């Protein structure tokens, strides 16, 4: 386990060399419309019908202790079957986070891996950060959860939401969308919680 954890830190150090995370502040003066807007409700229904999906993009992470950026490959099937692969465009290093029926497995391209039934514990132990991957599938496609406090923008798409998970308040701002595809899907997302910022750019929605 120590070898894998050390290797994860090395991978993040490599990814750090390509880090370029900007626009960390939440947008202001955003105009909202009613959640009962017909166009939004139709879009919301479409999002709920998207059960499994793949997406490719980039993410940048900033905390008081570290920062890094990386490419990602997200393959989602259901809450117990998804894979998040992190990799750099300037090296061969990769890190894979896989959810399965028995729990979670984190592995690298050198064959080292660690598994645990408690996914949150494993992420905290190996990656060193708390991130609600179980909610990520909804957040990435711009679908607010039923218990989230959200706002709809003038573009009739999700603009922002706030959600408390394990006592931590999370906010998400949807900065831009791929509007030339149907349905429109998020392009740039800014996630924040106490001392952590995650900026996501989805380059391709593969469905």
From Swiss-Prot:
Keywords, in A-Z order: Cell outer membrane, Chaperone, Lipoprotein, Membrane, Palmitate, Protein transport, Signal, Transport
Compartments reported by the entry? Cell outer membrane
> CDD domains, per this entry?
LolB
Lipidation sites, kind S-diacylglycerol cysteine, are 20
Q: Which GO terms describe its cellular component?
A: cell outer membrane
Keyword Transport in the entry? The reply is yes
Protein family membership: Belongs to the LolB family.
Known partners and oligomeric status = Monomer.
Q: What does this protein do?
A: Plays a critical role in the incorporation of lipoproteins in the outer membrane after they are released by the LolA protein.
Return the protein name: Outer-membrane lipoprotein LolB
């Amino acid at each position: 386990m120590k070898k894998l954890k050390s290797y994860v830190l090395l991978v993040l150090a490599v990814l750090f060399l390509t880090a370029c995370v900007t626009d960390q502040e939440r947008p202001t003066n955003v105009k909202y419309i009613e959640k009962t807007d017909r166009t939004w409700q139709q879009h919301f229904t479409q999002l709920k019908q998207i059960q499994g999906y793949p997406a490719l993009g980039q993410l940048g992470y900033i905390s008081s202790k570290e920062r890094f950026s990386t490419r990602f490959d997200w393959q989602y099937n259901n809450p117990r079957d998804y894979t998040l692969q992190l990799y750099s465009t300037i090296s061969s290093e990769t890190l894979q986070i896989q959810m399965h029926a028995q729990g979670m497995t984190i592995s690298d391209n050198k064959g080292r891996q660690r598994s645990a039934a408690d996914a949150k514990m494993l992420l905290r132990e190996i990656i060193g950060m708390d991130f609600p991957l179980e909610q990520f599938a909804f957040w990435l496609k711009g679908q607010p959860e039923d218990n989230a406090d959200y706002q709809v923008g003038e573009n009739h798409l999700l603009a922002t939401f706030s959600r408390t998970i394990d006592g931590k308040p999370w906010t998400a701002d949807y900065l831009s969308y791929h509007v030339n595809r149907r349905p429109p899907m998020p392009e740039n997302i800014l996630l924040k919680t106490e001392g952590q910022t995650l900026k996501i750019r989805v380059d391709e929605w593969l469905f």
